[in-house]
Amino acid sequence: MNIISPSILAADFGNLNKEIERISEAQWVHIDVMDGHFVPNISFGLPIVSAVRKLTAQVLDVHLMISNPLTYAERFVKAGADFVVFHMESDDDPKEVIRAVRNAGAKVGAAIKPGTPVEVLYDVMDSLDLALIMTVEPGFGGQSFLYDTEPKIRALRTFCNENGLNVPIQVDG
């Protein structure tokens, strides 16, 4: 099954209600959180997640492109995230981030940048509800798809199939 999770990165936040209404047919809403450290851009944080949660019952897929996801994971769940997706390249121990998100009551995903080997996900795949492969460099919207990321998607699907894992793979970019 394919799920489309429209990003609100380019939304008009002066008309957030209308923007969420425009994507109301989608099952999920993708919220990119950027801190200006892990990626060079800054987007938005807890107040936007909370505002979107008040506007919709859609699944909120919160993608943390931040240096220290462990510090914020529980707060994003309390703000309304259904999924918290962190980057394997962040400063925190992935297993601790996974545990923190689960303990806070949300589902958890792990992401990798285009230049990161897909194999870094293998050790945690059995603990994830979702794996995200970036097909653009994180931090900016409107980039072109990096076709050399396609083999990673296939390799991760093969790994899941060979290990009896039913973990959805999200492609972002």
Can you annotate each of these PLM segments?
Residues 141-146, 170:
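Short, glycine/charged-rich beta-strand-loop motifs at protein surfaces that mediate ligand recognition
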Residues 35-36, 136-140:
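A short, flexible beta-alpha/helix-coil linker loop
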Residues 1-85, 91-93, 100-103, 107-108, ...:
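Conserved N-terminal beta1-alpha1 strand-loop-helix module at the mouth
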Residues 166-173:
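Conserved Lys-Pro-Asp/Glu-containing loop-to-beta segment of HAD-superfamily phosphomonoesterases
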Residues 3, 107, 111, 132-135, ...:
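Conserved beta-strand segments that form the floor/walls of ligand-binding pockets within enzyme
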Residues 115-117:
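Short acidic loop-to-helix transition motifs that present clustered carboxylates
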